């Protein structure tokens, strides 16, 4: 409600990687791995969330699950996503549904792991597909090495994003680059970021940066301003 009062759009995001812990985080169960955690359990959560939030005017979309990966063979992500879509549409036929790709939603490997998502059916024809993209060598966003050590160039982001963006064009789908971010320790990262953002703009794909908020402290990807909100982080110059 506070966001709506300020005209701020909100994405409701279930940030569980298609897993759930029944023991306080010691172990995690995959959705579909057992009868204790099925696609219908996830669908029921979203049915209830949609019923609760559907009348707000600032819900940009329901992001049904962040970065699913290594799913159980008997319960592929595409099947789970379809069950959730069906459940949401029972109570909300208007709000966009955001579907993250498989394998950590990788933009670079979208075709290899997430091509089957194009078979999803939304009765309201209002799906948005979400990919994530980082510039380090292992695509993880941990940025354990330097710009040079990881062999990054000014076009690394564009080259990786093309796999996702071209897929969107090929199948006439809408997309969102829901995570991207760079360290604050080398200005060359900023050039790579800027080129990516120009490419996304030119292709009509919105994006959201990872990450912000006071809880991140000195995390090198964060864009939270310092000195009582008076000093911006370097990434904000892009």
Segments (PLM) and residue ranges:
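Short, intrinsically disordered, charge-balanced linker/junction segments flanking boundaries
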Residues: 235-237
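Extracellular glycoside hydrolase catalytic/binding regions
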Residues: 34, 40-61, 65-205, 221-233
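Short secondary-structure boundary/hinge segments and terminal tails
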Residues: 21-22, 186, 217-218
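Short, solvent-exposed turn/loop segments enriched in Gly/Ser/Thr/Pro and often Arg
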Residues: 15-19, 101-103, 210-217
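Substrate-binding cleft of extracellular glycoside hydrolase catalytic domains
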Residues: 1-53
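Hydrophobic beta-strand scaffold residues
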Residues: 10-12, 175, 207
